[in-house]
Amino acid sequence: MKKISLPKIGIRPVIDGRRMGVRESLEEQTMNMAKATAALITEKMHHACGAQVECVIADTCIAGMAESAACEEKFSSQNVGVTITVTPCWCYGSETIDMDPMRPKAIWGFNGTERPGAVYLAAALAAHSQKGIPAFSIYGHDVQDADDTSIPADVEEKLLRFARAGLAVASMKGKSYLSVGGVSMGIAGSIVDHNFFESWLGMKVQAVDMTELRRRIDQKIYYEAELEMALAWADKNFRYGEDQNASQYKRNEAQNRAVLKESLLMAMCIRDMMQGNKTLADKGLVEESLGYNAIAAGFQGQRHWTDQYPNGDTAEALLNSSFDWNGVREPFVVATENDSLNGVAMLFGHQLTGTAQIFADVRTYWSPEAVERVTGQALSGLAEHGIIHLINSGSAALDGACKQRDSEGKPTMKPHWEISQQEADACLAATEWCPAIHEYFRGGGYSSRFLTEGGVPFTMTRVNIIKGLGPVLQIAEGWSVELPKAMHDQLDARTNSTWPTTCFAPRLTGKGPFTDVYSVMANWGANHGVLTIGHVGADFITLAAMLRIPVCMHNVEEAKIYRPSAWAAHGMDIEGQDYRACQNYGPLYKR
């Protein structure tokens, strides 16, 4: 089957169409703007899969309807999913704009004095607003000379932020969310909302009963040689942690081996269900070899599976990580307990950064007073105002141990194309695999246990659905915190010391939900959240605006907030603007 091509970014150089001197004098400058924009994006951006982003430039500058149509024909044939219009001069507004209502679009109007690029930008944006097709405005802060071909830092920041978010939109469109199982323990996020996926994300939902996973395992619908490779890899790399189960629930060596084998098979089969596996076709299993075109998935697990079979912790942790027995590779997005809304937050984070995501329970707010009462020690540094304990039974990406290093030698989580095998090995070495607690998981399993290094910038996010309003996005930028060992051990033991842990300190603003750490916890909309590496809340805000998902909570600096220009016409308070604009325009893929 032909592989689906990656979306490209289309660059549209627009120009003043008056011949006999005007157009001719602008052709080179205008096309050079397009080439410079394409070069910037190609140099600095990757798809989430690691491939370099490709740009497609219109064959000619666009002065009117005919050339605009020719450009659109070219873009349609090359899977262009995002467009950037560039110009240094006056052009004819509504005659030259990109009219595709579902494709993210931006306009860069050159800030120069010789020709009025700013005037075209304003005229074109007015046309976009009047026609109900929002576009992003890019206009440099400082005047440039006409022969200055450089891209100023503020323009570059907006171009790249727009391109990252726009490619995320284009990459999700037409894909599916694979729901393996149904509702887990009454968790609202696992009540998978087809309308949300279809209308806001342009995705489908593929619902598959967990018996399909059972069938694939029992009937050996997998690549058997790969299973042996996975087992050998686990034997080499897995360190096993404490077994906290009562003696009557402890498993013997043979039983533990069977649990490990099934856990690895679950990872293989869920992966194959998501993306397909051509080796299955060689076994005559053509239908199963295709997969479900899933860009994200969720596994119900509890309790209809886990009361009898090994839990999904090992499978989910390995799939969500940037490496496994096949080496370093793109992480998958698999939500535990089939929490599809947390899965979408994971998907957003992965598409924006190319990194693995940490899925966690937003478990406990620890106040400074409570910590001192319990441990006899005081919180300090980033943790001085309290922490949020993020911990789940083991589905967090192993990258979350933060044993990878940035260019300054600081702990981080890298895009998978930058991760060395040594860094992957370090993450594995920092992880223990603890037998699942019987009272939670009667069918057994292994939970990964690691502790996230401290001082690492993170952005915590969550999508929620509100009846009568639709989806909303929550964002909290902050840092991981590493507590003194004795303090950590006491706090960890009160929940479960066999699970992966991240202590998170959000950045406080002194206002609203970020008045204090308690307020962040109290305003969080669900029991789960996602950690994405870096302070990337501004990228999430731009992406949400493209999809028409209002942001109900964030601590991003106002200067970094970047939304379509039409949002400014929806009132004077920027967060109210967001709600009114999203309601006015409705979901991107209206149904």
From Swiss-Prot:
Its main location: cytoplasm. InterPro entries: Fuc/Ara_isomerase_C (IPR004216), Fuc_iso_dom3_sf (IPR038393), Fuc_isomerase_C (IPR015888), Fucose_iso_dom1_sf (IPR038391), Fucose_iso_N1 (IPR012888), Fucose_isomerase (IPR005763), Fucose_isomerase_dom2_sf (IPR038392), Fucose_isomerase_N/cen_sf (IPR009015). Pathway: Carbohydrate degradation; L-fucose degradation; L-lactaldehyde and glycerone phosphate from L-fucose: step 1/3. Pfam families: Fucose_iso_C, Fucose_iso_N1, Fucose_iso_N2. One of its GO terms (molecular function) is arabinose isomerase activity. Mn(2+) binds at residues 337, 361, 528. Belongs to the L-fucose isomerase family. Converts the aldose L-fucose into the corresponding ketose L-fuculose. This is L-fucose isomerase. It comes from Salmonella gallinarum (strain 287/91 / NCTC 13346).
